[in-house]
Amino acid sequence: LETEFLRSLDAHNFFSGYAEMLKHGLISTPEHLAELLAFDTEKIDYALLKSMVGRSVQVKERIVEEDPLEHGIRKALNLGHTVGHAFESLALAERRPVLHGYAVAWGLVCELYLSYIKTGFPKDKMRQTIQFVKENYGSFTFNCKQYDQLYELMKHDKKNTAGVINFTLLKEVGDICLNQTADKETIFEMFDFYRECMGCLLYTSDAADE
């Protein structure tokens, strides 16, 4: 595994890739996730980073080999992407494009909240992960008037079945729940949570009304 080229990445592209590694930690083991959350992103240890990239590659390789046609466990790799793709699409439509990994990181915030309320994901691990995202990725800003637009974008995600929004959620780190759904009210509640915990209410036009 050749990781020397990681040194050439600017900060934004580094964090974009790191978001996928964070996802791998969430679908792997508590130890793997803890290492990712503890990594010093301001003073990068490239030797340690190389070993962490290797672990991420192993996680993805194991899943893809087990389910090459994505009929089952490979859907675990979609964690954070259902909402993340909607954020990407909205950002592009508004001519404020974002890197894929940033959208995934923000999507993880939303989908960990769904995991917390629907499948019992531990609140402390949700909060730890959200804090890491908040500190390293900032936030994607939107207001409540855009909830319907985001919802419609999510309905058109290629991973859906028969028009039903499909989520990959977690009961615990590494305990994956595939093919999960949520009604519109719950999804809007998820957006409320995201905007509150990420500080978006401070920057959007409807803040005074809420």
Give the ranges of each region predicted by the language model:
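A glycine/threonine-rich phosphate-anchoring loop and its flanking beta-alpha core
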Residues: 1-39
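Short, acidic Gly/Pro/Ser/Thr-rich loop/turn segments
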Residues: 6-8, 84-85, 175-176
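Generic alpha-helical structural context detector
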Residues: 19-24, 54, 131, 152
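Catalytic, metal-anchored helix/loop core of enzyme active sites in primary metabolism
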Residues: 66-68, 91, 187-199
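Conserved small/polar residues in nucleotide/adenosyl-binding loops
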Residues: 203-208
